[in-house]
Amino acid sequence: MGQLKQLAGILALASPAIAAFSVYALHDPDALKASLGVTSECLSALNYTVECDGPSAVRATKNSDNDPWSMDDLTTLCTDGCSKSLSTWFDAVEQKCEGEEVTINGLVVDPKAFPMKYISGYDLACLRDSNDNWCFYEAQDWDSGVFTSWDKKQPDACSGENPPADCDKKGSEEDVDTLYVTNSYDKELYCSECFMLLWRQRIESPVFPQGNLLDHFTKQFSKLEAACSTKLPLTTPAPTVVLGAKDTLPPATGYHTDGSTVFRYSSPPAPTITTEEPIAKRTAAPRAMKTFYTPATPDRTPQLGAMAPCGKYYNVVAGDTCASISSEFEVTMDELLTYNPELHPNCENLWANFAICVAPVSPNPMTVDGSCGENNAGATCDGSPFGSCCNNEGRCVPCGPEATAAPDAPDAQGQTVHDDEPPEEPHIEEPPKDIPAGDDDDRKKAKLPLPSGKYPLPSNSTMISKDGSCNEYISCVGSPFGVCCSTSGWCGYGKPWCGVGNCVSGYCDTEDKASGKPQ
């Protein structure tokens, strides 16, 4: 909290927070209270409305080197109002949840863990040196496998649900020597104020993984001080939010850091025995489960942020993990996160008694033989040479009097069949005439200007994506799946979809925007 309050005094940015968020805004309070096992007063504090930009605040908690931030991103998050609001949130939880515990899928959590995680992400992202340089922004240009290995490798390997047995083993002295930070950077860089402030900020964070990793980073900080002939006060926070002293926990409970000092298992998780790669690392598995062409209706409150429409929901029960759900429904962890964007990568917010999306709504396949409808694998007639309407016998026919569907009633594909005149076929926008044939790649890389205000909808002649797939003529803008169509043909937000070279259509980043430099 000391770093946050100090930053609150120096971050005198004029622009206010552009949005606000609360962690459980869309959940039913009674169901959530029963699931978490807390009082109404504590739940109200946990659900405090934080005056920060929500997507940026969540992004900061993930703290990944694979997710580059622009200056606009940082100034959106790092406001004086956001800093003060995070501090107020922590104080409210500390007061209203005193003595309470939150139980989440076998984890016992001190409620303070939730605001502390957001505060820690904010402190790191918004850190500036005495010359007002943004340290986190500058660090994105530093190149070394040592400093970034914690973000890129350690959480994936050692902070997941089933960490390898050697995660807590110390390496040989020879291995340790090769990891000295002073052997990996130029002295001018590692003695810079930003470098040392960032290093200290990480190890002072209450959510930095405890154990050998913290010991190693602390020793490296001492080497930095000695090499740079400087001394910075260092306070390693006591794990005050760990529920029970670590040395009093029975070994069988499997003390679980999960990227934080605030979690422990209330009961040991079932061991996972497999010769395959971790589910999160697998490529897309052939899906044995049914493909869904119509939206499903959940019979429980959906997981916060679950995609809509969703082809299939699964009701989470106590003891489920993301790994077990991924395995059961033959989806990768990346796919599960795509279907449930607000789900944290370490699955700490996977709630029992809520519905999680495990399959998307897929587009109907085009008929190949003139058969159509639900009894024919959901095949659609639209655009087929057999006719664009599906009759009651499951055959494609031309729309009009010869179609057997009831007049002025929707057919199997949702089209209205008239008995007086055939409906007009949907118009697909042709490619621009001034681009010669063969220049498809250049057209895909064309940069569209960034809009001001809300994203305007595409023209009536452009189809809007119904399932997250897209191309030059099926737009993501106006769909719930994103505002950019990537080169892989899927809608989304952020650099993997909107970045220069990654974006086919929609609100693609320009070179200036992608550079992250103020315009």
From Swiss-Prot:
Give the record's GO CC terms. extracellular region
Full protein name: LysM domain-containing protein ARB_03442
Role description: Might have a role in sequestration of chitin oligosaccharides (breakdown products of fungal cell walls that are released during invasion and act as triggers of host immunity) to dampen host defense.
Every LysM domain range: 312-358
* Low complexity composition-biased segments: 407-416
Please give the SUPFAM superfamilies that the UniProt record associates with this protein: LysM domain, Plant lectins/antimicrobial peptides
Report disulfide bridges, numbered on this chain.
C470-C485, C476-C491, C484-C498, C503-C508
Note what the entry says on domains.
Answer: The LysM domain binds chitin and potentially related carbohydrates, and might be involved in damping host defense.
Annotated stretches, region: Disordered:
407-458
Region LysM domain: which residues? 314-358
Question: Which keywords annotate this record?
Answer: Chitin-binding, Disulfide bond, Glycoprotein, Secreted, Signal, Virulence
Sample GO molecular function, one term: chitin binding
The lineage's top-level taxon is: Eukaryota
Cellular localization per UniProt? Secreted
Q: Which organism is it from?
A: Arthroderma benhamiae (strain ATCC MYA-4681 / CBS 112371)
Q: Which residues are glycosylated?
A: N47, N460
| Bias (Basic and acidic residues) ranges | 417-433
Q: Where does this protein chiefly localize? A: secreted
